Curated annotation (Swiss-Prot):
GO terms for molecular function: nutrient reservoir activity. This is Sweet protein mabinlin-3. Belongs to the 2S seed storage albumins family. The keyword Cytoplasm does not apply. Heat stable 2S seed storage protein having sweetness-inducing activity. Heterodimer of a small A and a large B chain linked by disulfide bonds. The keyword Disulfide bond applies. InterPro entries: Bifun_inhib/LTP/seed_sf (IPR036312), Bifunc_inhib/LTP/seed_store (IPR016140), Napin/2SS/CON (IPR000617). Pfam families: Tryp_alpha_amyl. It comes from the Eukaryota. SUPFAM superfamilies: Bifunctional inhibitor/lipid-transfer protein/seed storage 2S albumin. Keywords: Disulfide bond, Seed storage protein, Storage protein, Taste-modifying protein.
């Protein structure tokens, strides 16, 4: 976990992923977010992370959004974490698939 935390910091706290997750949480639906630049940048950042750290850093990115107070109400929180768990699939990161973490 400390290793993953370090990776999180090295990759600018996955800022692009945080932006993508915030939009997904606030707006729900996929809409154009699936093709947006934030998602592309996010996937690029994610591919640079060691495989065992992919899910832990995504969890950190989701938590960072919570702490920043951008996410309101249980529905947005659920969407935030669902989107975070799905990112390895969306980014087609081999051998990671869907993350298993829950909210905490």
């Amino acid at each position: 976990e400390p290793l993953c935390r370090r990776q999180f910091q090295q990759h600018q706290h996955l800022r692009a992923c945080q932006r993508y997750l915030r939009r997904r949480a606030q707006r729900g639906g996929l809409a154009d977010e699936q093709r947006g630049p934030a998602l592309r940048l996010c996937c690029n950042q994610l591919r640079q992370v060691n495989k065992p750290c992919v899910c832990p850093v995504l969890r950190q990115a989701a938590h960072q959004q919570l702490y920043q107070g951008q996410i309101e109400g249980p529905r947005q929180v659920r969407r935030l974490f669902r989107a975070a768990r799905n990112l390895p699939n969306i980014c087609k990161i081999p051998a990671v698939g869907r993350c298993q973490f829950t909210r905490w």
